[in-house]
């Protein structure tokens, strides 16, 4: 909880977050449901700022993707789509990934190391 509050304060104090939103919004994810098929091209296009990996596979053999960004001592785990049909957070994560490319985020990425699983339940996302 405390780390979330720090993260939120840093985000709110970033001077241009709201004015940049239209330029950072991930417009490729417009569908109601999001699956690995939708996010894999976006993951492949992320900059070298992100360390990408396959954390494992689902029961049906689908990849569970992981990302690491930042280098700070506060370590934060973020996941989305534990329930496969709940994709709103996944869409928001890709907005956030675009925002991390902004120089405004260096303070955050120097303070925190974020471990991110964009789709925790890829089988549920396909159902």
How would you label these PLM feature ranges?
Residues 2, 6-127:
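Structured catalytic-domain cores with a bias toward divalent-metal coordination
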């Amino acid at each position: 909880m405390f780390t979330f509050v720090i993260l939120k304060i840093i985000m709110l104090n970033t001077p241009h977050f709201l004015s940049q939103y239209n330029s950072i919004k991930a417009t490729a994810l417009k569908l109601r449901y999001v699956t690995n098929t939708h996010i894999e091209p976006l993951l492949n296009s992320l900059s070298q700022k992100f360390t990408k990996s396959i954390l494992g596979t689902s029961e049906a053999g689908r990849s569970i993707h992981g990302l690491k960004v930042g280098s700070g001592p506060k370590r934060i785990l973020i996941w989305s789509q534990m329930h496969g049909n709940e994709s709103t957070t996944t869409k928001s994560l890709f907005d956030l990934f675009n925002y991390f490319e902004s120089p405004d985020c260096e303070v955050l990425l120097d303070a925190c190391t974020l471990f991110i699983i964009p789709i925790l339940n890829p089988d549920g996302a396909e159902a």
